């Protein structure tokens, strides 16, 4: 390919099912993030937690990604995904989200192909440009103002490399001559594109299998689904992306007061901002309270929820997430 823009997403992502529009929508899938530091507690503890998650009927385990966030903390998302994949034989892993513009696309394609060999069909690759910490971007040698353009170029390169075909690229950011990654994954890796802006939603329409939202209303979510579909049609994709998702911090406990007491300090510590800045987008209370908050998003087209549950203990977080899934299936 002469430039990343030459890659057609229709050629590198699964074709939509023409009969899907005639079926009732499936209940939303529900995944969760593990407690912070789980992998550092050793394989026995981490493996037991993943077995508990899978046994509760939760659909996937999630992992984030940061290089040097706010005060310098981070944990590489694809290293986490690899470790998690080795600790359970079947549980899917959802990266939510990997900061793709901070990396070289050929190296990322190699990592993805290797994970596909170790855990076939189990990775959902959520990507984003990063928004909360511009300093994290700049210390990686990337101009924060170029993140969107770099994402477009990276996605086009990664998608084509994962098909096992050579890539020649004379782009704005990358020069490649017959780059090749083998063996290619036996099945396409779903790529879900995160971000709050219209630009991110359009990117999902052009290059993604779905959009991953955060901090938005059900009305905004429905508008995003429509905008992604319009963008997909504009670039000639055979159908709209449909793997739309929401990332949701939530508090799960026996009462609203107890749930908020878990959620608020956790979010303030992570983002270094007052909880009130996020509160209207973050449900807390019992599983019924959280499911009631999420149901309008499912009605707006959300197929997956990635919960970041905060509870008095990990067992209650798992049980609460599983209960939310069951309640949404009945909604």
Task: Explain the meaning of each model-derived region.
Residues 1-331:
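Active-site-adjacent structural elements that line small-molecule/cofactor binding pockets in enzymes
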């Amino acid at each position: 390919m002469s430039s990343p823009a030459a890659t057609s997403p229709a050629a590198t992502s699964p074709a939509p099912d023409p009969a899907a529009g005639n079926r009732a929508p499936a209940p939303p899938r529900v995944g969760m993030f593990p407690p912070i530091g789980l992998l550092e507690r050793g394989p026995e503890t981490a493996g037991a937690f993943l077995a508990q998650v899978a046994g509760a009927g939760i659909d996937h385990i999630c992992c984030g990604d940061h290089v040097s966030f706010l005060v310098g903390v981070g944990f590489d998302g694809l290293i986490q995904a690899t470790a998690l994949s080795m600790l359970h034989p079947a549980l899917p892993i959802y990266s939510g989200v990997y900061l793709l513009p901070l990396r070289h696309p050929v190296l990322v394609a190699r990592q993805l192909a290797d994970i596909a060999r170790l855990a076939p069909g189990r990775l959902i690759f959520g990507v984003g440009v990063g928004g909360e910490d511009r300093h994290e971007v700049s210390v990686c040698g990337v101009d924060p103002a170029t993140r969107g353009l770099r994402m477009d170029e990276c996605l086009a390169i990664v998608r084509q490399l994962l098909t096992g075909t050579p890539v020649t690229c004379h782009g704005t950011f990358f020069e490649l001559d017959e780059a090749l990654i083998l063996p290619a994954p036996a099945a396409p890796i779903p790529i879900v594109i995160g971000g709050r802006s219209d630009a991110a939603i359009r990117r999902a329409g052009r290059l993604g299998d779905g959009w991953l939202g955060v901090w938005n209303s059900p009305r905004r979510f429905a508008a995003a689904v429509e905008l992604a579909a319009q963008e997909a049609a504009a670039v000639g994709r055979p159908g709209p992306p449909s793997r739309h998702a929401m990332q949701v911090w939530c508090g799960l406990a026996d009462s609203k007061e107890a749930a908020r007491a878990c959620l608020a300090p956790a979010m303030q510590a992570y983002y270094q901002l007052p909880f009130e800045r996020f509160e209207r987008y973050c449900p807390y209370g019992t599983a019924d309270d959280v499911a009631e908050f999420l149901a309008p998003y499912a009605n707006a087209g959300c197929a997956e929820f990635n919960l970041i549950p905060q509870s008095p203990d990990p067992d209650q977080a798992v049980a609460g997430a599983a209960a939310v899934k069951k309640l949404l299936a009945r909604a």
